[in-house]
UniProtKB/Swiss-Prot annotation:
Protein name (Swiss-Prot/TrEMBL): ATP synthase subunit beta
Listed CDD domains: ATP-synt_F1_beta_C, ATP-synt_F1_beta_N, F1-ATPase_beta_CD
Gene3D superfamilies named in the record: 2.40.10.170, Bovine Mitochondrial F1-atpase, Atp Synthase Beta Chain, Chain D, domain 3, P-loop containing nucleotide triphosphate hydrolases
Source organism (scientific name): Dehalococcoides mccartyi (strain ATCC BAA-2100 / JCM 16839 / KCTC 5957 / BAV1)
Keywords: ATP synthesis, ATP-binding, Cell membrane, CF(1), Hydrogen ion transport, Ion transport, Membrane, Nucleotide-binding, Translocase, Transport
PROSITE patterns according to UniProt: ATPASE_ALPHA_BETA
Subcellular location: Cell membrane
Residues given in the record as ATP binding sites: G150, G151, A152, G153, V154, G155, K156, T157
PANTHER family with a match to the protein in the record: ATP SYNTHASE, ATP SYNTHASE SUBUNIT BETA, MITOCHONDRIAL
Catalytic activity: ATP + H2O + 4 H(+)(in) = ADP + phosphate + 5 H(+)(out)
Assigned protein family: Belongs to the ATPase alpha/beta chains family.
Assembly, per entry: F-type ATPases have 2 components, CF(1) - the catalytic core - and CF(0) - the membrane proton channel. CF(1) has five subunits: alpha(3), beta(3), gamma(1), delta(1), epsilon(1). CF(0) has three main subunits: a(1), b(2) and c(9-12). The alpha and beta chains form an alternating ring which encloses part of the gamma chain. CF(1) is attached to CF(0) by a central stalk formed by the gamma and epsilon chains, while a peripheral stalk is formed by the delta and b chains.
Pfam families on file: ATP-synt_ab, ATP-synt_ab_N, ATP-synt_VA_C
Example GO molecular function: proton-transporting ATP synthase activity, rotational mechanism
């Protein structure tokens, strides 16, 4: 191992000098011994005169010029394998849950190449989530990438938590959750919820939260992904990878780019935005050994879907769940917009003719209702034709039937969560479209599971 010395410290950026014959490679981890442990840096660039520019994963308070720096000769490596299940880690692979040492003998570097083209495997198998609006309009592909897009406070994290709960309990494989630049409170809540629901023993969690240095938030997704890759490649498992929030990964890259003095690109983003996003997303792949199905929450700043940080994610997704503020304001939860959400596998050859037709007919009715809203606002319902009145009535029932009580929000709403099978979802919407429930009041369809629950709710309402 080569030794160098600190020659400059500016915030979390540390310049280190080595001898000419022992320069560390890019992305190597460097260690600085401290009284209370060690400080870990990552080499970002060679700046000439035998100097390297590094980013620190820990606060640089008290670091002095001349301090000794040790080159570990390899990128940052984290523990992998079954010993990581049920545990919580930071970006360095250190346990955060005060439950003793990690029983894992293997480690893997967080910087790795994506699988080769000859190793990839594409799948068109539907992964049932138990959430009606998703299963009907934007079905998930096993081994695909799914994005939940929305502004602040529209329910991205709740939706991700519900997906974890539903799929982890139904799904036999392992899950990895990466908290990227999100709230520590949400991470704590999620940990306890997973412990209570019994899915924690099959889950590995990594956190790099809002208050951490940009280098941590930039690399935490790679730490989680590396753990998921081990389960896919070595254990030959189908893995679920949850990333909340992928936009914070982009934002951390922007901060790091500014710290390193790179010229900014559009809207202040880093010039390497597409490269960084591609390097992460291309590793989230399904191979002949196993699959990684990823669910990514995507924060949309100021609800602007043209923001370069959001657009950089679009091209990598197989399905897109758009969360709409106007639906959240009407308390239509989950606030998924069925007209803006889509999936690569909503195709009659994959999901079947019946599913495809029901989904498209639901969208057709909702689109017609949207087109008529201006007319209704100005002239009122009375001016509509009988056919349009019927369309509006069914659209309003469909809107309410798309809502669903969540397991993870039971404690707030007082309504028990519902898991609805895909078969029941298709049957319910088909019956509404056929007019079998035109006589039922609209409110009977709100926050229920199956269509039978809506009929039972209507009986309760009529009895009052």
């Amino acid at each position: 191992m080569a030794n160098g010395k600190v020659i400059q410290v500016i915030g979390s950026v540390v310049d280190v000098e080595f001898s000419a014959d022992s320069m560390p490679a890019l992305f190597n981890a460097l260690e600085i011994p401290r009284e209370n442990g060690k400080m870990v840096l990552e080499v970002q660039s060679h700046v000439g005169n035998n100097r390297v520019k590094c980013l620190s994963f820990t606060p640089t308070d008290g670091l002095e010029r001349g301090a000794e720096v040790i080159d570990t000769t390899r990128p940052l490596s984290v523990p992998v394998g079954r010993g990581t299940l049920g545990r919580i880690f930071n970006v360095l692979g250190e346990a955060l849950d005060n439950r003793g040492d990690v029983k894992s003998e293997k480690t893997m570097p967080i910087h790795r190449l994506a699988p080769g083209m000859d190793e990839l495997e594409s799948s068109a198998q539907v992964l049932e989530t138990g959430i009606k609006v998703i299963d009907l309009i934007a079905p998930f592909a096993r081994g695909g990438k799914i994005g939940a897009l929305g502004g602040a406070g529209v329910g991205k994290t709740v939706l991700i938590q519900e997906l974890i709960r539903n799929i982890a309990t139904e799904h036999e494989g392992f899950s990895v959750f990466a908290g990227v630049g999100e709230r520590s409170r949400e991470g704590n809540d999620l940990w306890h919820e997973m412990e209570d629901s019994g899915v924690l023993p099959k889950t590995t969690m990594v956190f790099g939260q809002m208050n951490e240095l940009p280098a941590v938030r930039l690399r935490i997704a790679l730490t989680g992904l590396t753990m998921a890759e081990y389960f896919r490649d070595e254990e030959r498992q189908d893995v679920l990878l949850f990333i909340d929030n992928i936009y914070r990964y982009t934002l951390a890259g922007m901060e790091v780019s500014a710290l390193l003095g790179r010229m900014p690109s559009a809207v202040g983003y880093q010039p390497t935005l597409a490269t960084e996003m591609g390097a992460l997303q291309e590793r989230i792949a399904s191979t002949k050994q196993g699959s990684i199905t990823s669910f990514q929450a995507v924060y949309v700043p100021a609800d602007d879907y043209t923001d370069p940080g959001v657009v950089a994610t679009f091209g990598h997704l197989d399905a897109m769940i758009a969360l709409e503020r106007s639906l959240a304001e009407q308390a239509l939860y989950p606030a998924v917009d069925p007209l803006a959400s889509n999936s690569r596998i909503l195709d009659p050859q994959v999901v079947g003719e019946e599913h495809y037709k029901v989904a498209r007919d639901v969208q057709k009715v909702l689109q017609r209702y949207k087109d008529l809203q201006d007319v209704i606002a100005i002239l009122g319902m009375e001016e509509l034709s009988e056919e349009d009145k019927l369309t509006v009535a069914r659209a309003r029932r469909i809107q309410r039937f798309l809502t669903q009580p969540m397991f993870v929000s039971e404690v707030f709403t007082g309504r028990p969560g519902q898991y609805v099978s895909l078969t029941e979802t298709i049957r319910g919407f088909k019956e509404i479209l056929e007019g079998k429930h035109d006589s039922l009041p609209e409110q009977a369809f709100y926050m229920v599971g199956t269509i039978d629950d809506a009929v039972a709710e209507a009986k309760k309402l009529s009895a009052v």
